[in-house]
Amino acid sequence: HSEGTFSSDYSKYLDSRRAKDFVQWLMST
């Protein structure tokens, strides 16, 4: 169960990182 919670938290973390990277990329172009 803790593994499932970890993976969902991790995917949320990856999504937020990807969103930040995307915004940075939009700003830089």
Curated annotation (Swiss-Prot):
Signal sequence segment: none
Pfam families: Hormone_2 (PF00123)
Coiled-coil ranges from the UniProt annotation: none
Origin organism lineage: Eukaryota, Metazoa, Chordata, Craniata, Vertebrata
GO molecular function: glucagon receptor binding; hormone activity
Family annotation (Gene3D superfamilies): 6.10.250.590
InterPro entries: Glucagon, Glucagon_GIP_secretin_VIP
Keyword presence, Hydrolase: no
Protein name (database record): Glucagon
UniProt keyword terms in alphabetical order: Hormone, Secreted
PROSITE patterns with a match to the protein in the record: GLUCAGON
Keyword Hydrolase: no
SMART domains noted in UniProt: GLUCA
PANTHER family, A to Z: GLUCAGON, PRO-GLUCAGON
Underlying gene: gcg
Cellular compartment(s): Secreted
